[in-house]
Swiss-Prot record:
This is Deoxyuridine 5'-triphosphate nucleotidohydrolase. It catalyses: dUTP + H2O = dUMP + diphosphate + H(+). Residues 141-150 have a biased composition (Gly residues). NCBIfam families: dut (TIGR00576), PRK00601.1 (NF001862). The gene is dut. One of its GO terms (molecular function) is magnesium ion binding. It comes from the Bacteria. Its cofactor is Mg(2+). This enzyme is involved in nucleotide metabolism: it produces dUMP, the immediate precursor of thymidine nucleotides and it decreases the intracellular concentration of dUTP so that uracil cannot be incorporated into DNA. Keywords: Hydrolase, Magnesium, Metal-binding, Nucleotide metabolism. The lineage of its organism: Bacteria, Bacillati, Actinomycetota, Actinomycetes, Kitasatosporales. The keyword Transcription regulation does not apply. One of its GO terms (biological process) is dUMP biosynthetic process. Residues 138-183 are annotated as: Disordered.
Length: 183
């Protein structure tokens, strides 16, 4: 079943940049490209311009998501993922990237695909303060409370625990990076 696509107004800030496009039928995200050449050293972050700005219809927002290939092959992540583009924003879309590879620099060329733009309908809600929230099966469980990862397995004795101090300063992610560097 095919639906008519939502029309989103777009302006090229850089007259030569290709417009965001879906790589395959059925893709949720349209590829965004950078308009600059930039090299990122290990651990370095940068704000990359995309050369486009959009006018989204009221009731919609766009979300800037990472591209899995950049993460898997180069260690590039988005610092603010997903980045939110509100319907009223008219400035150039920019993407904050970071090179998480501990050893290799990453080079971006002009018009490299750097992120995906996903447009979604959003609801505005009314918040109503209450003294107590209704119960649920999950209750206050968070941060891995549902399991699904060996490091969160109750049998290992680490379920629900947050890393404490040590050489990574209490940052469990940093300890994973340190372990990877040692391989």
């Amino acid at each position: 079943m095919s639906r008519a696509g939502l029309e989103v107004l777009i302006r090229r800030v850089d007259p030569d940049v290709p417009l965001p496009a879906y790589a395959q039928p059925g893709d949720a995200g349209a590829d965004l490209r950078t308009t600059v050449e930039r090299e990122l050293a290990p651990g370095e972050r940068a704000v990359l311009p995309t050369g486009v700005s959009v006018a989204l219809p009221e009731g919609y927002a766009a979300f800037v998501h990472p591209r899995s290939g950049l993460a898997a092959r180069c260690g590039v992540a988005l610092v603010n993922a997903p980045g939110t583009i509100d319907a009223g924003y008219r400035g150039e879309i920019k993407v904050i990237v970071v090179n998480l590879d501990p050893r290799e620099s990453v080079r971006f060329e002009r018009f490299d695909r750097i992120a995906q733009l996903v447009v979604q309908q959003v609801e505005r809600v009314r918040f109503r303060q209450v003294a107590e929230l209704p119960g649920s099966a999950r209750a206050e469980g968070g941060f891995g409370s549902t399991g699904g990862h060996a490091g969160l397995d109750p049998a290992s004795g680490t379920s629900g625990q947050v890393a404490e101090g040590g050489p990574t300063g209490g940052n469990r992610y940093a300890s994973v990076v340190s372990d990877r560097e040692g391989q």
